[in-house]
Amino acid sequence: MSRRSISRKPRVLVDTTFLLPALGVEVEEDALKAIALFRKLEIYYLEVGVLEAMWKVLKAIPPEHLEVVKVGLNSIRNTYNTLDIPAEAYTEAYRIYNEGHKDYIDTLYYSTAKTTGTPWLTIDEEFIEFLKQHNYKIEGIIYTPEDLKSIIR
């Protein structure tokens, strides 16, 4: 269920990387700098991104720190908005996966951003290059942290 917002802030779908710090998992400096700008954006996430984040938590967070994870999960859910993945996005993600990018979650993020018109913030340069090489549209669909300052009013 999405939180409704009457703000006119730019909408952005965030990659799993940007959920990880709330769960106690370290990320790249570029991601942390982008997160500092989130208050100026209307942030969306995918539930599959939370699942992907939990796979990283299983590897990085010891059991005695699970309370941090729980607080972080609640924070994500209470602060950001969920974005439902349209059926069309699932099938487009399948096609992209079959073209050679073997991370289905990445392909879901991209296809959801494209289908819903909610740009996707990612630091995954390898996937961006894959999309370019396969003639997928990037402009207006994918943002990198460097792009954020130009879209914030």
What are these regions (language model features)?
Residues 1-45, 60-71, 149-150:
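Short, well-structured N-terminal submotif of metal-dependent ribonuclease cores
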Residues 32-99, 107-115:
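PIN-domain endoribonuclease scaffold, especially VapC-family toxins
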